[in-house]
């Protein structure tokens, strides 16, 4: 029996079965290798504030690359030029634009775009172009929506809660009190190095700094007003009196008004002869006096 069992174990398996057991199953995705890129554009980041209609429009244009970071990818103007080349292929050539990150490349690309806009009599605010070049928060999204309306003649409802003021004031007000910027940090964050290189005018930069300082002071006042306990702000004398005004003070005021009205009424008197007299209070040169008339 033992020999028979050993013989059964030593029997060769069929060719089909041996091939199945000998060859390991290949993994679905080889380890260490990235899957092949699909033709579908990747999903936009959650921080993107573009509407769905604008995102679908960008996907339908079949651009050379999809803008995953709207603030960064539209700053050099290459994608903007590519969008205009799709709509006006005979007036603009994409080969004259360069997809780079240097300030010189950005200024050259946007200078060509501005010439094209002036030729076609299209109007794009220069503030939006300036904010897009220097990566101001929220500005590229507004610029893309303006281009979408300009080319498709369709108005969209903006999904941004607040207007862009080219600073991070709204973002700082949403933060807790501790991690908010100081004045020096606010100046560093809101004035880019590219702005100083493109516009080295000292006077304009000083005006920007003064505006940021005033904005920081306003933010500080609002923080103290909204969070008095954090800053240990004590109430003023007027606030204390309003909060602790006694209830009987209103009764005194009402009584004083009633007594004044009674004093204003004419009082009738009679003299020794029995003739009735009426006292009339007359105000002359600021001093009250009594005038009597015989009836």
From Swiss-Prot:
Testis. Residues 284-295 have a biased composition (Polar residues). The keyword Nucleus applies. One of its GO terms (cellular component) is nucleoplasm. It is found in: Nucleus. Gene3D superfamilies: Calponin-like domain. It comes from the Eukaryota. Residues 1-34, 251-295 are annotated as: Disordered. Residues 270-282 have a biased composition (Basic and acidic residues). May play a role in apoptosis regulation. The lineage of its organism: Eukaryota, Metazoa, Chordata, Craniata, Vertebrata. Signal peptide: none annotated. It holds the Pfam family CH_2. Keywords: Nucleus. This is Spermatogenesis-associated protein 4. The keyword Methyltransferase does not apply. It comes from Mus musculus. Residues 48-154 form the Calponin-homology (CH) domain.
